[in-house]
């Protein structure tokens, strides 16, 4: 009986020491838990074709990259992400590529800065973006 009590106590202490929080993918440093936003072109909302797969790939200054899926109206919602500055690339995959390109990429000229406490972001795609 003592062995069972020791095992239970050891397990509980392990949870207390190591925690059972969210997996941060091995990232060490400050993060935000959730945020949302949208992409714009010349200050106007962007619409993507229904069924088109659109992702904003962001590159943290630490070298880590993350994919942010966008909805047809250019909106996004994300769980955790490291605080800091990001370079960005917009990737679009058409619903039915046919004979055209299977994926197009656009380098977003501005950078994204994730800040502690900020929950809403607007990302301007820049004057050279072609809807």
Regions found by a protein language model. Give the residues of each.
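Short amphipathic beta-strand segments in non-cytosolic proteins
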Residues: 50-67
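Beta-strand-rich domain onsets/edges
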Residues: 17-35, 99-104, 129
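A glycine-anchored, Pro-Gly-centered beta-turn/N-cap motif
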Residues: 82-85, 117
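A short, solvent-exposed beta-strand micro-motif common in secreted/extracellular proteins
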Residues: 84-98
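Structural motif
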Residues: 38-50
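Structured interaction patches on ligand/partner-binding surfaces of diverse proteins
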Residues: 94-120
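Short, surface-exposed beta-strand/beta-hairpin micro-motifs centered on an aromatic residue
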Residues: 66, 71-80
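Sec-dependent bacterial lipoprotein signal peptides
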Residues: 1-18
